[in-house]
A protein has these predicted regions:
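Phosphate/ribose-recognition catalytic cores of enzymes acting on nucleotide-derived substrates
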Residues: 193-249
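A glycine-rich helix N-cap at a beta->alpha junction
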Residues: 72-89
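N-terminal catalytic cores of NTP/NDP-binding nucleotidyl/phosphoryl-transfer enzymes
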Residues: 9-72
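Classical nucleotidyltransferase
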Residues: 99-197
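Glycine-rich, highly charged phosphate/nucleotide-binding loops
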Residues: 68-76, 100-106
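Residue-level signal for inorganic ion chemistry
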Residues: 27, 80, 119, 178, ...
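Short acidic-hydrophobic, aromatic-tinged amphipathic segments that line or gate anion-handling sites
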Residues: 2-8
């Protein structure tokens, strides 16, 4: 997967099919979107694109003081690449960018700069200044060059999957339910020095203090999350960018 930071100097993508969003957690609902994007790209022998934002818009707009995120940008890149996406475009989210109207975002950025031909949206996705744009507003506008598709809600056990629901599960140490909603184990990407984890993103969602069964790059270990101080493993190994996955018991 190719990763691009910014939208002003992009290559010409081949018949691109895209989706846009924060994709926090890259959960089961997101997987439905990603599968559709890949499918529509293949129909035209094109490329799949995910457009996301960094930092998370809520951080910049300060709309939620206690915000915690399921995935850091590095974790998101790892999960999207594993999902088979061809290209990830990371738009730097600023207060100035937040004032971009929905029509400008579609016309200037998605169509003008990325050349998007097919756009796949979640059922509740909003975009543009004050979240003024959505699937309905796009359907009613005249965009003859843009194919538009909407993905309906995705549920597990009768419950709609969302990043908010998964955050609550992780917060309450319900790691097995979180994994079912995500479609993969909850994970941390961290630098490990003599067993101690360094997590640079202060917004990363961690489960509460306790002892957890995890794998570190596929090796079963125990993870200890203290009330204070850094999380640490029961083995004193050192590795940059280690993938710590919670075992769903």
């Amino acid at each position: 997967m190719k990763v691009f930071h910014g939208i002003d100097r992009l290559p010409a993508f081949r018949h691109p099919a895209a989706t846009v969003g924060s994709f926090d957690g890259v959960h089961g609902g997101h997987s439905e979107l990603l599968a559709a994007v890949r499918r529509f790209a293949r129909e035209r022998d094109g490329e799949s694109i995910v457009v996301t934002f960094s930092p998370h818009p809520r951080i910049v707009l300060e709309t939620q003081t206690d915000l915690r995120l399921l995935t850091t940008l590095d974790e998101k890149v790892w999960l999207l690449e594993r999902a088979g996406i061809d290209n990830l475009v990371v738009i730097p989210f600023t207060r100035e960018f937040s004032r971009t109207g929905s029509a400008d975002f579609i016309r200037r950025d998605l169509i003008g700069k990325l050349g998007v031909e097919t756009l796949v949206m979640g059922y509740n996705h909003h975009f543009g200044h004050n979240k003024e744009g959505d699937y309905g507003s796009l359907r009613s506008s005249e965009r003859p060059t843009l194919r538009l598709y909407r993905i309906e809600p995705f549920s597990v056990g009768g419950e709609k999957v969302s990043s908010t629901v998964v955050r609550s599960l992780v917060e309450h140490a319900e790691m097995a339910r979180a994994a079912r909603m995500l479609g993969h184990p909850y994970l941390l990407m961290a630098d490990v020095a003599r067993g101690s984890l360094r997590i640079d993103d202060p917004y990363k969602q961690l489960p509460p203090a306790g002892e957890y069964s995890v794998t570190a790059d596929g090796v079963p270990v125990r993870l200890f999350i203290p009330s204070e101080g850094a999380p640490h493993l029961d083995r004193p190994f050192t590795k940059e960018k280690s993938i710590i996955e919670f075992t769903a018991l």
